[in-house]
A protein has these predicted regions:
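Alpha-helical transmembrane segments of multi-pass inner-membrane proteins
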Residues: 14-20, 90-97, 135-176, 182-248, ...
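N-terminal hydrophobic segments of proteins, predominantly signal-anchor/transmembrane helices
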Residues: 22, 28-48, 55-115
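Interfacial loop-to-transmembrane-helix boundary motif in multi-pass membrane proteins
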Residues: 30, 79-91, 112-115, 124-154
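Transmembrane alpha-helices of multi-pass inner-membrane enzymes
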Residues: 63, 375-383, 390-433
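A membrane-periplasm/extracellular boundary helix in multi-pass inner-membrane enzymes
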Residues: 150-160, 229, 245-289, 302-307
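Long extracytoplasmic/lumenal interhelical loops at the membrane interface
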Residues: 162, 166, 176, 276-340, ...
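A conserved mid-to-late transmembrane alpha helix and its immediate loop/hinge
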Residues: 186-188, 222-225, 231, 311, ...
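Loop-to-helix entry and N-terminal half of a specific, functionally important transmembrane alpha helix
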Residues: 356-389
């Protein structure tokens, strides 16, 4: 059965305006409609066309593809290992999902998702071909952070969401405190959206002199918007990225630190009375947080691994009370696409993080090096967020923007010439004379 069209007239007007901008703006400004749409257009409103549903972002993706085609702006891109891993993740996850459900509805659903994900990634891959392109995207995001700040502050002070005029946007209350969410479908999504932007806001603030004040102001605005969501996952993610940004001088020891974390987790699992993932239930910085649900979901997924390892599983409600709500991206990957999809997802995260660290260590200029470190910290921020939530809504835009940026970064690491040690240069010079 088809769902109803839920988009309001005002949201539809905004969508049409953004689509028009996507068609007419110069290529260097192509990311502008996507950034503005992600920040100011609700993601949970749809237009139904037959069996197909179109949200704002999906409409903009299709318009962006059309624009690149009709204006002959498609630039050949050499696909690297990261691109191929991402394509494999898309394809394998979609195929296994269809095999799991074995229905035309599942085929249509995954086909639509596959086209949306690949097209969004491809449009961003076409748009992010240099650090200048990425900087422009983050300038736009910083401006949007400052533009959204007064609206979120009003929601925090009054409990009335100014974006309610767009329809279907409300403000929840937890323990007597408003959980602000602006245009986002959930307060946690808004918090994580801004929390995971902070590392590169800081990175560009340290690199740029002209727009330094803009980026630092965006950091402050993002921090405020994270805190007023009254959600533990965004707050903990923000704290974690802050600690990792401060660890920049120790970037050469990242591999050692990672193995140390693995050893610590194993040691805790051995000495604790319960499994190490019970720590998830105990971590909470906001009153009323549901860490117990995250723990129960992880525990149930491990106990029921035989149900989803091969082709995923159709439902998780039988695992326990409330566990049909999969608030863990890693588990969602396994439930929808089995162990193969989950492993590919984890490999993508690992390869991207390693490429960012290598580039950060390689660069001699500290400002450039810190920028690459900011990409690494952003990836880790998402990795931590995935433990407490599965992504939906506007945050998909910055997630795929990050993936496209990492693909560009991976090319920098593996295609750029390696620096020659100074000793070798001196030896060659002496030999020449």
């Amino acid at each position: 059965m088809n769902g109803p069209t839920t988009i309001t007239e005002l949201t539809l007007f905004i969508t049409i305006a953004l689509a028009a901008l996507t068609l007419v703006l110069p290529r260097k400004y192509l990311l502008l409609p996507y950034v503005v749409g992600a920040c100011f257009a609700p993601a949970d409103q749809t237009v139904m066309v037959g069996e197909l549903d179109f949200q704002v972002l999906r409409i903009l993706v299709l318009v962006g593809m059309l624009r690149l085609a009709i204006r002959s702006e498609i630039v050949p891109i050499r696909w690297n290992r990261f691109d191929k891993l991402l394509l494999a993740w898309f394809v394998v996850g979609s195929v296994i999902y269809v095999l799991q459900w074995r229905s035309m509805g599942a085929f249509i659903n995954r086909s639509g998702r596959f086209v949306e994900w690949m097209c969004l990634y491809w449009v961003f891959r076409q748009s992010v071909r240099s650090w200048r392109d990425l900087r422009f995207a983050y300038v736009l995001l910083a401006v949007c952070a400052l533009a959204m700040l007064p609206f979120v502050a009003l929601e925090w002070a009054t409990g009335t969401n100014p974006f309610a005029v767009l329809g279907r946007v409300v403000t929840d209350v937890r323990e007597g405190q408003y959980r602000c969410q602006a245009t986002f479908p959930h307060a946690i999504m808004m918090g994580l959206f801004w929390a995971t932007l902070v590392p590169l806001f800081v990175g560009f603030a340290r690199q740029q002199t002209q727009r330094r004040l803009l980026f630092w102001a965006a950091v402050a605005a993002s921090t405020f918007m994270v805190m007023v969501t009254r959600s533990s996952t965004p707050v903990l993610t923000l704290a974690a990225v802050g600690v990792l940004l401060a660890a920049f001088p120790l970037r050469r020891y990242t591999s050692t630190a990672a193995w140390g974390v693995v050893a610590l987790v194993i040691a805790l699992h051995i000495v604790m009375n319960g499994p190490v993932w019970t720590l998830v239930a105990r971590v909470g910085v906001i009153s009323g947080s549901t860490g117990w649900h995250r723990y129960a979901l992880i525990d149930a997924a491990i106990r029921h691994a035989s149900e989803w390892m091969l082709l995923g599983t159709r439902e998780t409600g039988s695992w326990g009370w409330g566990l049909e709500d999969i608030t863990n991206q890693y588990i969602l990957e396994g439930v929808r696409g089995g162990a193969v999809t989950l492993v590919l997802f984890c490999i993508i995260l690992f390869v991207g993080a390693r490429a960012a660290v290598r580039l950060s260590v390689r660069w001699q200029d500290k400002r450039e090096s810190y920028l690459a470190w900011g990409v690494f910290v952003t990836i880790i921020g998402h990795c931590l967020s995935f433990i407490g939530v599965s992504y939906f809504g506007q945050i998909a835009m910055i997630w795929y923007l990050l993936l496209a940026s990492v693909a560009f970064l991976y090319g920098q690491v593996h295609e750029a010439p390696k620096p020659v040690p100074r000793r070798a240069v001196v030896a060659r010079t002496q030999h020449a004379y």
